[in-house]
A protein has these predicted regions:
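A short, conserved structural fragment
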Residues: 336-346
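Short, amphipathic alpha-helical interaction segments positioned at domain boundaries
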Residues: 354-364
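Short amphipathic alpha-helical interaction segments
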Residues: 321-338
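A short, basic N-terminal segment
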Residues: 1-37, 42, 60, 354
Length: 364
């Protein structure tokens, strides 16, 4: 059975990432040069996929071990210890052998920290001491093996115990021995993390914004995907690029929908595009409705105003929703920080084109 050339569910494999060659090259240069990077972009914008490609490319030049530490929804120091242990337990080869020897000398067994921490408070290990031991083991191992540490959704660790302080205390001595990438989807929090003097990682990483995909990149990806499977994209490629507004995941979701409606040896047309768009609309509507429904009334009003007028401060919208400028400002800033709105060049727009489309069609 044929497989769609437009995967869009979850992070992509390194060889599936397209349209980000320049960004991948920049990351390879920085990580290979041991320059810490803070990669910022909305969720589902391809941060993890891009980092996978970058470390894969780096590995072609210099065999490198990569540790992936995901801090999304981090809740406690114990939670951090478990996630770090899980990330380290996925390593293999000589890196893992060296890591196990060092950890063993600290009476630490990589891979079973979760079970140990879930024992009773009296018999279980101290979470903070465990994090110190894990970070020490990692740092000492990287002195002997080229390593990249990727910390995803790092902003979720802000205010969670002292995990960032502990991490900083161990990483500062091995900055020149490892590539270090911080990734996050909350722009304001990422700025605070690396720009506020009271934060442990103040001025410790070069910020890199992941922008929307250019129109020509999306058009090329769609045409190439169709052609690789004996199909012609026709006008669908341009329609996807226009509707998708540079959103990588949504653009590929639309391309996938159109591809399945196009038989091998044929070409897509306007009818294909309309059918694909309608199918994606129907499939995504329940999730969009649920997402919108849990927002505060003010946030809902701001999103509706942006869709209708391109600005959250339109006087007519403020009167219509009975909102003050101050409440609109607070809601807008929160939506920007959460990655749902983007601003720049005097304009404001929704990050998710399907959400914007749903609001425009469903709400007055």
């Amino acid at each position: 059975m044929e497989r769609s050339p437009f995967p869009h569910s979850g992070p992509l494999e390194a060889d599936e990432v397209t349209g980000r060659d320049d960004e991948a090259a920049d990351l390879v240069r920085l990580l290979g040069g041991r320059v810490p990077v803070a990669l910022v972009a909305p969720r589902r914008y391809g941060k993890t996929s891009l980092l996978r490609r970058a470390v894969w490319l780096l590995d072609q030049v210099e065999p490198t071990s990569t540790i992936w530490l995901d801090l999304y929804g981090l809740s406690s120091v114990s939670d951090f210890a478990v996630r770090l242990d899980r990330a380290l337990s996925r390593t293999t080869g000589r890196f893992r052998e060296h890591l196990d020897r060092i950890a063993g000398g600290l009476s630490l067994n990589i891979g079973i920290v979760s079970a140990e921490l879930r024992r009773s408070a009296r018999s279980g290990p101290d979470p903070t001491a465990t994090v110190h031991a894990l970070m020490d083991s990692l740092g000492r191992t990287t002195e002997h093996h080229p390593t990249v540490l990727v910390i995803d959704e790092v902003a979720d660790a802000v205010g969670v115990g002292n995990v960032l302080e502990i991490a900083r205390s161990h990483l500062q001595s091995v900055y020149r021995d490892m590539g270090l990438a911080f990734a996050g989807s909350k722009p304001t929090m990422m700025t605070r993390l690396f720009a506020d003097t009271d934060q442990p990682f103040y001025s410790q990483a070069r910020r890199m914004e992941l922008e929307a995909l250019p129109v020509d990149a999306i058009v090329e990806v769609v045409h190439r995907g169709f052609a690789s499977t004996g199909r012609h994209a026709g006008p669908v490629a341009a329609a996807i690029a226009s509707f998708g507004a540079g959103h990588p995941q949504r653009s590929m979701e639309l391309a996938d929908g159109a591809w399945w409606l196009t038989e091998p040896g044929t070409g897509a047309d306007q009818a294909t595009w309309e059918a694909a768009l309608e199918a994606v609309r129907v499939r995504s509507a329940p999730a969009l409705r649920d997402f919108f429904g849990v927002l505060s009334g003010t946030k809902q009003a701001v999103l509706r105003a942006v869709v209708r007028t391109g600005a959250p401060f339109a006087a007519s919208e403020g009167r219509f929703h009975d909102l003050s400028n101050s409440s609109i400002t607070i809601a807008r800033d929160a939506l920007v920080d959460e990655g749902h709105l983007r601003t720049g060049g005097g304009t404001t727009s929704l990050v998710d084109p399907l959400l914007a489309d749903w609001i425009a069609r469903e709400l007055p």
